[in-house]
Amino acid sequence: MDTQNTPVHFNLWHRDFWRLCFANLFLMTSIYMLLLSIPYFMAKEGYSVTQVGVVYAAYGLGIFLLGGFCSYLVQRYRRNRVCQISILGVAVSLVVLYYLETFWNIKVGFEMLVAMRLIQGAFLGLAEMSLASTLIIDTCESFQRTEANYISSWFARFSIAVGPLLSLLVYNVFSMNVVFPVASVLALVALVLVSRVKFPFKAPSENVSLISSDRFFLPQGFPLFINIVCIMVILGFYLSLPHSLTVYVMFFCGLFLALVAEKYVFADAELKSQVIVGLILIAAAEFVSLSDQGFAEEMLLPALLALGVGIIGSRFLLFYIKLAKHCQRGTSMSSFFLAWELGLSLGIGLGFWLVKDVYQKSPDVDMAILNPVHEEFLYPAFGLTVVSLLMYNFLVHPWYMKHRNR
């Protein structure tokens, strides 16, 4: 029996590791703050819901653009500099559109919005690949690296709840206009944290291919990649809807419960059980959405959904690490990140397309977010849940047991 239980090394929690973990949290939070602000402003400007979905989904494609160059860049140049410049690119992309419209009164067209999201995704992808796949691994001993990957991924996972929470708080205290500069400041905080960590100098490699799958994509993990994308599309459907502050608080609580459950409930459980239980919890959340009771929709549904996604995410991350061959740990981390973000962004983009009347333009700027409904994609979400469960139980899990290397 293979279990989830991971030993805890207290000497891993040194100052540099803390800095990089919080840099990961702040960087991803800056991106998820746009979950509310992008549809808000596009609805206010009269864009169609389909266009909103395209702009959001463009980010999920953008994260692949610079991945093939990651290995060359971190081996040819100082790896922390690559990460810092990438984070700076994210910060600039977050604030440039706000600056153009606010101070120069330049209205940006739909094509420009798509291009900016592609660029934003490209910088974010390179930043995460160099941070999670290289820098965090470099700060710990070899026997601590699985634990370091596991912990740092949880910091990024919590940003799914923290980003919209912070965005709503900024919206309530100031206005939605302030969200973009606040998100940019968070990215700059991540940049400062990475800059405070000292990395030993490594001589640049000369014979490195300009483009490669190293530190980018793990080909032998493709079945797992597809399974993760399908599951994250389900979460993306839900996150494409406007929600109250309470919903995101409960989503955060659900993620925290998943973290606790991994430590105490699944510590000695059979390997397959974690993903299956997670998918059952997601299905339960989908059935709760049929309820007309506000308590169930605002409290129980997001908690169940986050609990399911949280425990699935950690297990699939460890699957990816165990599929990696020698010197492929960074590649496995990047592949997991790509699958996670691609599925989420595609789900959000498709969610806007499936639900046509959620975001409506209003004469009152502060009331542009209206009419939360989610029955429209209950059937596709439940269908994807069933497909993901069957895929995992009959294809992915047997395949993983046959091909794992650790």
Please tell me what each predicted stretch does.
Residues 5-60, 220-250, 348, 352:
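Helix-loop boundary and gating motifs at the non-cytosolic
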Residues 54-73, 249-262:
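Central cavity-lining transmembrane alpha-helices of secondary-active solute carriers
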Residues 88-107, 280-294:
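C-terminal ends and interior cores of transmembrane alpha-helices
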Residues 116-155:
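Cytoplasmic helix-loop-helix junction between adjacent transmembrane helices
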